[in-house]
C-alpha cells in the first residue's frame, strides 16, 4: 500500500478501505474539515455520509480521513462522521503543521486538503475529492496568508478533484502560485478556471482535459517520470446549482470586509468567510456547496477507476 512503514498505532485503515487497496479497487479519499468547519450540523454529517454513498454507487470505495483520539484514520464509521459534525469548530482544524501535535496529544482533528493528502499518500490512495482547495488569500501581498494546501500540491502525489479554489480567495494569485511550483491545473471540460460557486472566472486553467481517462493517463505519466507533486482537477459546479456571479461576489466582498474589521486571520478565516457568505446568501451558497461536492465525488470516482485500470 505504501512504501513508508508506519505504526498501526498512528495510522488505521478501515476494513472496507484495506480490502479495496489490497484487491486494487479504486479508492477516493475525502477530507473532514468540510464536516467540522465547512457546513453546519446536521447538513455536514448528512452530506458526508451521502457523498460516501455516491462514491460507492460509482463503483469506487470512499475513504473519509480524520484524526480520532490521536489516530490518523482512513475510512470513518458513521458514528465518527457524526461526532465531527456535532463537535464542529471544537474539533481542531489540522494542516501539515498541526498534524504531529494533534496525534501526539491524542486529540480529534479534522483534516484540511493538505493533511488529507498526506494521510491519503501514506495509505497509498491517489485520488481525493473535495469542495475547493485553499489558496492565496485576498490581500496576501500584505499578510502573506497562503494556504498550506498549495505547497502540499507541489510535493505530494495525490490528484485533487475540486470546483477550483474557494472563491473567497485571490484566484489570480492562486493560479500564479500553482504555476510557479509546477502544479498542473486541469480544467475538466473547461478552459476557464471554475470559481467554486460559479462555473467560470476571468482566469484560465493550464490545460483542458475532457475525460477521466485522459486525466488518469496524465497521472501515470507524471509520477512514472519522477515528477513528484499533485494535480488539481477543476470541475465546474453543475449549471443548475451555480450562483449568479454578482450575488456571490457581493456577499464575498462584504464577508472579507467584516473579517478584516474583526481581525479574523489565519486558519479561522476560511470557515468564517464561508459561514458568513452562507448567511448573506440566505443559505443558497450552502446548497451550492453541497451539490458541487457530490459532483466532484462522481468525477473523482471515474478518475480513480481509470487510474486503477492503467496503473494496476
Curated annotation (Swiss-Prot):
Changing residue 289 to A: 17-fold decrease in reaction rate while modest decrease in substrate affinity. Binds 1 manganese ion per subunit. Can also use Fe(2+) and Co(2+). The unusual metal binding site is heavily hydrated, coordinated with an aspartate side chain and five water molecules, and likely plays a role in anchoring the PsiMP phosphate. Substrate binds at residues 93, 113, 147-149. Changing residue 149 to A: Loss of activity. It catalyses: D-ribose 5-phosphate + uracil = psi-UMP + H2O. Its EC number is 4.2.1.70. The active site is at 31 (proton donor), 166 (nucleophile). Inhibited by Zn(2+) and Ni(2+). One of its GO terms (cellular component) is protein-containing complex. It comes from Escherichia coli (strain K12). Homotrimer. This is Pseudouridine-5'-phosphate glycosidase. Its cofactor is Mn(2+); Fe(2+); Co(2+). Disulfide bonds: none annotated. SUPFAM superfamilies: Indigoidine synthase A-like.
